[in-house]
């Protein structure tokens, strides 16, 4: 009897620890920036676009040039050790429609894959958190949906929680493709709206070597089903250039 009680007590304690870890965990979807949460050891996080959408419109030779792209991007995250996780990503199946001067073309294929290691940095502050991500995007996708050359990047994220209602963060991403460099900065403001519903707003700045500056705005909503699952919806707009460019989509994230 005593042995049975000890076994049940151990199982209950394990469940309590698991629940605590799940409560402290945070997903990286859907913002352009990166969160500072790390997947607990023994758990798997699945973050899935349902789908992600982008739309570009420009004038070429006096005619409207429109491109609509849908892709079911996904990210798998699993804890390797305390404060360290492995990330495996895929841009997913992609469908694209191109319209120009009364003509229409549709293509579909597969996007690139990625692999990364994310490490939490202990700042010894209850409100201030930090994480680093070393990532490689491997150009394995079809010709229309690939970066063509591998991209290697180092990303840092620092977040500060002002209260239970509002927080802010800054993400810096440094990437190299062949001998070309690019840097991206994403300051983000996240806020609780009501109950399980929260929102975020962000500004995206990017400068690639030998390219013009790029700017964008993004905002979205996140509904926490529970500590282990959430739904999200987001929309963004690019501010550079004379054409129109929008992005957004829906997604679901689950921690197993």
Question: Where do the model's predicted regions map?
Answer:
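Cleavable N-terminal export/targeting peptides
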Residues: 1-28
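Transmembrane beta-barrel domains of Gram-negative outer membranes and organellar outer membranes
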Residues: 22-256
